[in-house]
């Protein structure tokens, strides 16, 4: 960086989750007043990944904003909403907005995210260039709001004009989430996926099969290896000859890094904008990129956690710490949808290693870990998330596991002890507060006797049920058993 | 027959002592906190009476030979006072330091603070309460403007709807308190327990969450996220009684359940279950304890849970709110009366000119002569014997070398002192390193007030006379003060202290009578946050204790915040906190989390309980999960070694399914555990991170 860190102007293009996290990092380092955010949407940065939760109804839309507008202002951050950047002029170190105004920078950060892919379906775009009103994308808060309006016009659920069915194009994480969200709202949903199984980028074919079966149980028909080709008045036509009658088509078929600005500015773009370990463009030391639009170490990610980690590193870099470096990130993808449990660790489709796998297609579960040198390097848990927290910790921290541990992690947890009280051996402790064994209780005749001679039940009171049961089941022998009495003598 | 209270934890259970020949016998007594119940520590509390290990004469150690010899009290006190005076002459007043304890009575804590500031003129005084509930204290002060552990009686637990215990194992650490949980459940309420170990408390839970140690904070953020997403926050309460919610509300937008799951290891579904339990409850009580508080981000963790309670509109509502389950017997009172580096009696701040003027007037000295803020407990110990640090330390009611974090280092600091003086009843591990050990009375032999976890001031009464040769801490303080030359404003003894005294004021006095000192304490606290001025020994006896604040003429305050919080605007504050994570994260060499805690039959460093023959003293152990045991080849009962970057210890393995497989647990009552713990400090409370560090285990 040529400028002194102290008064450099930092311009962030984009107002998504990566940009918001970067701003927080800059503010924490006192760089707020030097920061300008140019956001295309009219909403303050919000938590995009919860859009399907809003659609499903578990989250109110207002809960998604990551910071209030005032928060930015109070910290000196110049947040400009509704600001579309059309060009980066690297020669003059300015960015140009759609209204032709220019904003100078010393460091510019591209956090432009991804652009949803529009599958080539004829009839989606009508002759006049507008989108067919049945078709909805699902990437932004506005998309979500439109969809919600369609679904629940004036809150009249019985309105005959409301859609009753929907086809989701794309059987990835987002497609499944949207499908579940709509189904929870009572819409009949179908999924069209071009590949041969669901979640094909994340899980293998057998896990995909389990998922398809689960979706069917939940009432969602899935069409695999099928492409939507045409939207007509009769419905959505697939290349396998089917026509799906539908009121709504939601496009969730993935996205690609949004790198047009970088291309126009003649920065190196492969799949994404190519950056080094400091998230700096390999062409220009004053240009950076983070999040979905960036390509680091030949990898583009579509997930928020690496984007946030990149934002954290870049905040350090922009604050002058050139030793800060992004070294890649382990991705954990978690499906957020009612009655559908999926967790994907890393890239189980691509990682090599020993595979430990337990599946029960009847129960709809498929659990798999890829283990290399004792470490979990990837995995997919479908339909059964037991120990997901523990498995994720072992994956994130690259813990070296024992020989059989990966397998044990996949097995059901041994059920809680539930030991039958009457079987307690005489030396088992029943009352921890007073340190009283089952034998000493059995040697007593009544609860009062227990209280007076052993003080069991006089502390936390938690052993009272066990004591009662022991007294009730004590062998109804002659008054007091001499052996038990002497036992008592030795323990006190 | 003497009505008194248990010598141990912050419940201060009521009990009656009666003399049976040479022995003292404990019997039950009705008191609202414990209703006659006691744990085995309480039942056996009189067991130290007549112990052969009891010290009955001052001991002086020869530095050259390490040999101990008995001394008379005059010899010992003369020796200590003259050394203190000499050191002060050479290095200045701050060279002499004082370390107190949360087990000392209010009168002792008060007198100790006064002794440090007036007789020694030092700013260097702090106490082991920093290692107890200081994070909750700091959070309470920030959110409510005041810190009283529980702002309601403990028995209120029975009448709430959902009680959330964050990092508390009260069924083992304060067993009689668990009765209130059981009764809550009998009444149809729910108990939630959050702990890396499924403890006897967790076994009582309707919902048990088992997070990675050090992640209680993101759990709270996740709960608030879900409450806000569902529209379950109390907007009216927030608008009328609080400030700062908008920033907090926005900050939790980044903590959706699956994100929390990844960080905390708690499944998203469980977090949802907790949020829905809270959203649908009329009354919610959130209680934190050491598990949540003893972290380098302990204050922030408590604040995050406080934010949950505030967002639900609970604090100030009857049978609801937030509270801290203080640990030590007088953890509450101990922090209110001036043995903390930044405070004067009545929970007054030492840098507040009005507070200084008030307290100085009670003490009969010029406010100008009062020193300012000193080092916090760990920082004080860390500085001992260093060029800038104190050269002497007087220890009352604390067994530092067992209870301090990074104990090997702390022990080396003690070794570099010119003078270490320990007042204790037995030759504790810390006393064994001292130059002078002063034998002092124990609980049943002395009278004084304690303030329990509810902010209830209670009275312990002497039941027996102390053994010959034993004196009270109050006698030690008075004896040293007299020798240091400030009795009744007249310079006597070793070193006339260069103190300007206000004309017309009598100068400081050094009573040894607890009730007399309490009367002075009442005056010193008058008008402070922790106002005791309306409390008398007689009232305490008659009313089963009195809750502060209790200005003269007041009935006391069992339940706080019904109308106002203690900030100037009367509102509670939401405080936006971020999760940074534990200071020390697992690495390839130290791949596990280590956490520490207690067992039922022992108390603190065990100086008392390990000497009571009726309490099992099984020594330390290492709790680990069968998955981990398999991984490292450990077998139940066989020794394993636990290592951290600071030290190692060996103890038998206890293989249990109740602990997280990525975590090991060691109890801290025995030497060893704290050789392992991390001394990273909370930026606000200066609490060390006892509850999590990176560790390795090998068989």
Regions found by a protein language model. Give the residues of each.
Chain A
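A Rossmann-like FAD-binding core segment of flavoenzymes
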Residues: 32-34, 73-96, 103, 184-277, ...
């Amino acid at each position: 960086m040529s400028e002194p860190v102290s008064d450099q102007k930092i311009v962030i293009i984009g107002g998504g989750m990566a940009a918001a996290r970067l701003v927080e990092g800059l503010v924490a380092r006192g760089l707020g007043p030097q920061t300008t955010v140019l956001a295309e949407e009219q909403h303050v940065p919000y938590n995009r990944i919860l859009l399907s939760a809003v659609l499903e109804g578990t989250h109110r839309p207002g809960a998604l904003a990551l910071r209030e507008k005032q928060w930015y202002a109070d910290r000196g951050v110049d947040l400009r909403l509704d600001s579309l950047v059309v060009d980066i002029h690297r020669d003059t170190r300015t960015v140009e907005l759609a209204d032709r105004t220019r904003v100078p920078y010393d460091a510019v950060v591209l956090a432009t995210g991804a652009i949803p892919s529009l599958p080539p379906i004829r009839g989606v775009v009508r002759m006049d260039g507008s989108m067919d009103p049945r078709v909805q994308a699902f990437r932004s808060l506005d998309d979500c709001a439109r969809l919600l309006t369609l679904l629940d016009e004036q809150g009249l659920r019985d309105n005959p004009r409301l859609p009753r069915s929907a086809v989701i194009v794309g059987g990835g994480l987002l497609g499944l989430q949207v499908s579940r969200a709509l189904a929870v709202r009572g819409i009949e949903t179908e999924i069209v996926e071009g590949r041969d199984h669901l979640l094909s980028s994340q899980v293998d074919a057998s896990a995909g099969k389990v998922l398809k079966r689960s979706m069917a149980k939940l009432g969602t028909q899935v069409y695999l290896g099928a492409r939507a080709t045409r939207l007509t008045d009769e419905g959505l036509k697939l290349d396998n000859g089917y026509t799906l009658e539908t009121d709504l088509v939601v496009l969730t078929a993935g996205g690609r890094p949004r790198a047009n600005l970088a291309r126009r500015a003649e920065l190196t773009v492969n799949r994404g904008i190519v950056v080094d370990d400091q998230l700096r463009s390999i062409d220009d030391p004053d240009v950076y990129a983070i999040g979905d639009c960036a390509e680091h170490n030949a990898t583009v990610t579509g997930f928020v956690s690496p984007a946030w980690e990149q934002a954290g590193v870049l905040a350090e870099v922009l604050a002058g710490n050139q030793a800060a470096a992004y070294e890649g990130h382990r991705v954990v993808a978690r499906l957020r949808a009612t009655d559908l449990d999926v967790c994907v660790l890393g890239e189980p489709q691509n990682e090599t290693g020993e595979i430990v796998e337990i599946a029960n297609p009847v129960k709809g579960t498929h659990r798999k870990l890829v283990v290399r040198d004792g470490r979990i390097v990837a995995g997919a848990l479908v339909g059964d998330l037991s120990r997901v927290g523990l498995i994720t910790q072992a994956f994130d921290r690259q813990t070296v596991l024992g020989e059989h541990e990966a397998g044990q992690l996949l097995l059901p947890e041994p059920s809680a002890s539930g030991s039958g009280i009457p079987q307690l051996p005489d030396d088992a402790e029943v009352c921890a507060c007073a340190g009283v064994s089952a034998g000493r209780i059995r040697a007593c005749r009544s609860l009062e006797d227990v209280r007076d001679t052993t003080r069991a039940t006089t502390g936390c009171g938690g052993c009272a049920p066990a004591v009662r049961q022991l007294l009730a089941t004590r062998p109804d022998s002659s008054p007091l058993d001499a052996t038990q009495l002497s036992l008592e003598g030795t323990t006190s | 027959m003497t009505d008194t209270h248990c010598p141990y934890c912050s419940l201060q259970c009521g009990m009656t002592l009666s003399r049976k020949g040479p022995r003292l016998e404990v019997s039950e007594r009705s008191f609202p906190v414990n209703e006659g119940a006691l744990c085995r520590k309480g039942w056996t509390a009189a067991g130290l009476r007549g112990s052969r290990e009891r010290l009955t004469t001052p001991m002086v150690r020869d530095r050259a030979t390490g040999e101990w010899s008995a001394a008379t009290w005059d010899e010992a006190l003369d020796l200590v006072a003259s050394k203190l005076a000499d050191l002060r002459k050479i290095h200045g007043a701050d060279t002499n330091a004082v370390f107190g304890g949360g087990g000392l009575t209010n009168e002792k804590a008060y007198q100790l603070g006064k002794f440090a500031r007036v007789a020694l003129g030092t700013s260097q005084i702090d106490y082991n309460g920093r290692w107890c509930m200081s994070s909750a204290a700091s959070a309470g002060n920030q959110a409510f403007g005041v810190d009283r552990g529980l702002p309601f009686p403990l028995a209120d637990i029975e009448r709430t709807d959902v009680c959330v215990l964050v990092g508390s194992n009260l069924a083992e650490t304060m067993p009689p308190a668990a009765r209130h949980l059981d009764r809550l459940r009998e009444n149809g309420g729910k108990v939630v327990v959050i702990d890396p170990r499924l403890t006897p408390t967790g076994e009582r839970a309707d919902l048990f969450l088992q997070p990675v140690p050090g992640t209680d904070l993101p759990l709270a953020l996740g709960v608030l996220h879900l409450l806000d997403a569902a529209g379950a926050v109390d907007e009216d309460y927030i608008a009328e009684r609080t400030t700062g919610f908008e920033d907090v509300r926005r900050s939790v937008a980044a903590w959706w359940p699956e994100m929390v799951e990844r960080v905390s290891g708690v499944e998203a579904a469980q977090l949802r279950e907790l949020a829905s339990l809270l959203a649908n409850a009329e009354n919610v009580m959130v209680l934190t304890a050491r598990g949540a508080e003893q972290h380098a981000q302990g204050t922030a963790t408590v604040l995050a849970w406080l934010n949950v309670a505030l967002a639900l509109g609970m604090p100030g509502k009857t049978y609801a709110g937030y509270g801290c389950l203080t640990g030590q017997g007088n953890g509450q009172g101990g922090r209110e009366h001036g043995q903390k580096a930044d405070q004067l009696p009545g929970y007054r701040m030492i840098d507040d000119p009005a507070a200084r003027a008030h307290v100085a007037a009670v003490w009969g000295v010029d406010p100008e002569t009062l020193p300012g803020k000193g080092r916090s407990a760990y920082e004080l110990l860390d500085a001992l014997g260093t060029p800038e640090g104190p050269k002497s330390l007087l220890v009352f009611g604390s067994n530092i070398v067992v209870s301090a974090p990074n104990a090997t280092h702390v022990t080396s600091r003690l070794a570099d002192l010119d003078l270490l003086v320990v007042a204790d009843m037995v030759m504790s591990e810390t006393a064994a390193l001292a130059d002078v050990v002063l034998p002092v009375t124990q609980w049943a032999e002395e009278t004084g007030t304690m303030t329990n976890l509810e902010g209830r001031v209670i009275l312990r009464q002497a039941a027996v006379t102390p053994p010959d040769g034993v004196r009270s801490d109050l006698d030690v303080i008075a004896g040293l003060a007299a020798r240091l030359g400030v009795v009744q404003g007249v310079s006597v003894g070793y070193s006339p202290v260069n103190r300007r005294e206000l004309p017309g004021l009598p100068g400081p006095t050094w009573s040894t009578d607890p009730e007399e000192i309490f009367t002075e304490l009442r005056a010193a606290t008058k008008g402070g946050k922790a106002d005791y001025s309306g409390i008398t020994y007689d009232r305490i006896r008659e009313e089963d204790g009195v809750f502060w604040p209790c200005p003269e003429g007041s009935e006391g305050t069992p339940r706080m915040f019904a109308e106002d919080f203690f900030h100037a605007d009367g509102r509670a504050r939401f405080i936006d906190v971020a999760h940074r994570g534990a200071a020390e994260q697992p690495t390839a060499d130290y791949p596990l989390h280590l956490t520490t805690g207690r067992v039922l039959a022992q108390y603190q460093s065990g100086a008392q309980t390990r000497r009571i023959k009726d309490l099992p003293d099984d020594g330390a152990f290492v709790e680990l999960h069968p998955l981990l045991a398999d991984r490292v080849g450990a077998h139940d009962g066989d020794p394993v070694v636990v290592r951290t970057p600071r030290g190692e210890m060996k103890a038998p393995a206890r293989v249990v399914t109740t602990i997280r497989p990525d975590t090991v647990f060691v109890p801290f009552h025995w030497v060893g555990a704290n050789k392992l713990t991390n001394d990273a400090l909370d930026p606000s409370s200066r609490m060390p991170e006892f509850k999590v560090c990176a560790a390795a285990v090998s068989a």
